[in-house]
Every structure is written in C-alpha cells, then in structure tokens.
Amino acid sequence: MNSTTCNSTLTWPASVNNFFIIYSALLLVLGLLLNSVALWVFCYRMHQWTETRIYMTNLAVADLCLLCSLPFVLYSLKYSSSDTPVCQLSQGIYLANRYMSISLVTAIAVDRYVAVRHPLRARELRSPRQAAAVCVALWVIVVTSLVVRWRLGMQEGGFCFSSQTRRNFSTTAFSLLGFYLPLAIVVFCSLQVVTVLSRRPAADVGQAEATQKATHMVWANLAVFVICFLPLHVVLTVQVSLNLNTCAARDTFSRALSITGKLSDTNCCLDAICYYYMAREFQEASKPATSSNTPHKSQDSQILSLT
C-alpha cells in the first residue's frame, strides 16, 4: 500500500485522550516545579561546586528545556503535518535535551564508578573543572549530532515526527546510538559499583547501613534509566528493523512510539526526585536556613558518602 494513503494523524478514544491531557499537565507542573527548585538549590543554596553539583545542574537545565518544549511538540504532533519552523525548533530542543539527559546520567555513572572503583586515582581523574569540561563537550556533541540528524531528516522525508511517512533509518540510528551505548556504560558502571560496595567490609553498623543505602540508590538509578528509556528505543529498534508495508502496521508502531515516548518524559520528574536521595548536600541545602554557626560540610554523592 502506498504510504501516502496512510493517515499520519493518530486518533485515540476520548477516554485515552483525556488521560493523556491529564498526564501531560501533571508532568509539566510537577517537572517544572521540581526541577526549578532543584536548579535554585544547586545555584544558590550549595556552598561548593563539586562534580555532582555540576552534573546535576546541567541535568536539571536539560530536563527544564525538554519540559518547556513539550507543549509545542504535542501541539505540532496533533495539528501539524508539515515541517514548520515551530515544529522543527520545538522537536529539536526536545530531542537534544532528551539525549543530553541520557548523556549526563551516563557521565554521573562513570564519575561514580571512578570514585568507588578507583579511589586512589579519583583525585587526578575527577575535579569540578573536568566535570564542567565534560558537560560542555556533551552539549557540543549532542547539538552537533542533532544538526546532522536534522539535515539527514530533511533529505529523507522530514525532520518532524508528524511529517515522517516512514521511519528514516539514518536519523533513527542517531537515537539508537545515543541510547544503547550509554545504556551499556551505565549498566557496566552500576554493576561495578554495586560489586565493590558489596565486598567492602563495614567498620560499624552505621557504615553497613550507609553501604546498603548506597547500593539501593545505584539500583534505583539504573532502574529509572532502563524503565524510562528502554521501551522507546526497543520500539525504535523493531520499527527500523521491519519493513512496514501496511497502514495498520505503521499505525501500531506510531501508537507504541507515542506511549513509550510519554513514558520516557517521566524521567524529567524522576530525575528531580532522585536529587533528594543522591546528594546529601542537596538535602542539607534544601532545608530552611537556621541560626546554627556550624560550617557546611560538603558531601559528594558520587563517592556515595562512603569514602
């Protein structure tokens, strides 16, 4: 069947549409609120720029940018079937910050791995300046790859989601490479950290509890990463691997992409929630100011408060 005869606009039952509207509204409100508070704490309430603080500040910025672009992306998906400037700009910001978020989570996992697995070399391998350089490099790589993806997309039928009559192989390859490589790194680093922590002898009950909490946090971070992003990229992998010759098949995968894409957006809220548990200094800084004169003690979550 000719692809031009297929309806590119997804139609959902009224109840599903209402659920999506409520879901998107809650996601926007909670995500903007949580990440704005997190960014305020990182910028104004913390006393020292650690590696953790630099990575998480960039992560909060990426999540906020994605959330701000989300209403325009949803509008263009529903009401526009061509590559308008608004569509290209909003979806470009959306995609850039999705994969920037993935890249930053990967950088945090590597930083944590270095701190725990190679503590003697951590001082020369880790520093706030190096963390800032990594963030700048990641922004440049992500934005550059998005520009290349945009040019390839325009050559192959369209950059915007709604204008693509088929899934462009080269542009999808950017998405798959931008996830599966970070996934392998995050899984490796997380397993290494958990292994080291499980073998580390505890000096007392307090340290044993701290080790257990740190291990749980590593597993939780890995679970959030996999649950939010893996379903979307599995659907992309299947879609690019199959020859979708019928409108029904394309419609099915378009619905799967829509649902898994919304699932991936929840990462913006979950990232903000993880801030409160990953960094003890974030918990201290987010408390109301007191009259205590005790000096601030910086805690780096990447060492998981165990070194």
UniProtKB/Swiss-Prot annotation:
Residues 40-53, 111-129, 198-217, 279-307 are cytoplasmic. Coiled coil: none annotated. Residues 1-18, 75-88, 151-176, 239-257 are extracellular. GO terms for molecular function: C-X-C chemokine receptor activity; chemokine receptor activity; G protein-coupled receptor activity. It is found in: Cell membrane. It is a multi-pass membrane protein. It comes from the Eukaryota. Glycans are attached at residues 2, 7. The modification Phosphoserine is found at residues 286, 292, 298, 301. Residues 288-307 are annotated as: Disordered. Disulfide bonds join 87-160. Induction: Expression is modulated by the microbiota and induced by inflammation. The keyword Calcium does not apply. GO terms for cellular component: plasma membrane. It holds the Pfam family 7tm_1. Keywords: Cell membrane, Disulfide bond, G-protein coupled receptor, Glycoprotein, Membrane, Phosphoprotein, Receptor, Transducer, Transmembrane, Transmembrane helix. The chain crosses the membrane at residues 19-39, 54-74, 89-110, 130-150, 177-197, 218-238, 258-278. GO terms for biological process: chemokine-mediated signaling pathway; cytoskeleton organization; G protein-coupled receptor signaling pathway; macrophage chemotaxis; positive regulation of cytosolic calcium ion concentration. Predominantly expressed in immune and gastrointestinal tissues. Strongly GPR35 expressed in colonic macrophages. Belongs to the G-protein coupled receptor 1 family. PANTHER family: G-PROTEIN COUPLED RECEPTOR, G-PROTEIN COUPLED RECEPTOR 35. G-protein coupled receptor that binds to several ligands including the tryptophan metabolite kynurenic acid (KYNA), lysophosphatidic acid (LPA) or 5-hydroxyindoleacetic acid (5-HIAA) with high affinity, leading to rapid and transient activation of numerous intracellular signaling pathways. Plays a role in neutrophil recruitment to sites of inflammation and bacterial clearance through the major serotonin metabolite 5-HIAA that acts as a physiological ligand. Stimulates lipid metabolism, thermogenic, and anti-inflammatory gene expression in adipose tissue once activated by kynurenic acid. This is G-protein coupled receptor 35. It comes from Mus musculus. The gene is Gpr35.
